[in-house]
Amino acid sequence: MVEPEIPQNTGNIARTCAITGAKLHLVHPLGFDISEKAVKRSGLDYWDKLDIEEHDSIGAFLEKYKPEENNMFFATTKGKTKYTDINYSNMYEVFVLYGKETKGLPEWLLKKYLNTKTIRIPMLPTLRSLNLSNSVAIITYEILRQHHFEDLQETSTYLDK
């Protein structure tokens, strides 16, 4: 997540990452303090199960995880490829970057990778975008589906406890 602004979205995304085993990368500056009650409440009691890494800036993130050397995609309403048209099944590690709720990803980043690494979720042309946490969940579960939900429990035993 690049410069997220809404604490509840980040909490929901943290919960999705924790329950799926995905690593959450937070790129600063954040629009809130990560210890805020709204963030913690949205993530429930999953915070101690979350693999999280924070980065000082988008530049610091891209320097560490180079797009050309990694399976990296940029989720945007301006994307050229549907997220379902990517074959993730042969990718061991996948990075999907999402921008801030009000502006999305930086324009310079989209211009650089628009034709090669941008993905989008199809939607009606008359509306702006889905909620960020919903978008993260949709794309995360497509990647997991293509990996046959590896390491995830497909039937519930929660009620048996």
Which residues does each predicted region cover?
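Post-transcriptional modification and biogenesis factors for structured RNAs
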Residues: M1-K161
